[in-house]
């Protein structure tokens, strides 16, 4: 009976961790990554279109992203979209290909990004704890309605806490990995 409550809690905690992973891909490290451009929208015949749907993105070198537009006339639109996205990147074009050189991050910027990552981790932990609270409330409701015994309630709450601890540890690991990646020169 209480397994459904725990399953629901795991699902909520999974969402918090997945959201954190997705958010962390957008955090700029010293390395080039096409995920930096995920939110860049290009005006394609009057329709805002994701950059990866109007050209091929590649990372030929650790500090370089190249964009090969599928239509040459989109070069200027893509450059404009990158400037508008305010990523701190300056696109250069040779008429066929757009190059984005990722500048090395300053020490101050690295520390700033580390703080951002820690904040993301804390937000994810809040999501995990919220799922725990909902699960504990669900367990208490089951016990109140006499669907489970008091022993089952205690056992369930302990299991929920164990699951919560494992997810918090997973979040801490993700945050420390990303911080290490940011501080790497």
Swiss-Prot record:
It is found in: Cytoplasm. It holds the Pfam family RRF. GO terms for cellular component: cytosol. One of its GO terms (molecular function) is ribosomal large subunit binding. InterPro entries: Ribosome_recyc_fac, Ribosome_recyc_fac_dom, RRF_sf. Residues 127-156 are annotated as: Disordered. One of its GO terms (biological process) is cytoplasmic translational termination. SUPFAM superfamilies: Ribosome recycling factor, RRF (SSF55194). Keywords: Cytoplasm, Protein biosynthesis. Belongs to the RRF family. Responsible for the release of ribosomes from messenger RNA at the termination of protein biosynthesis. May increase the efficiency of translation by recycling ribosomes from one round of translation to another. This is Ribosome-recycling factor. It comes from Syntrophotalea carbinolica (strain DSM 2380 / NBRC 103641 / GraBd1). The lineage of its organism: Bacteria, Pseudomonadati, Thermodesulfobacteriota, Desulfuromonadia, Desulfuromonadales.
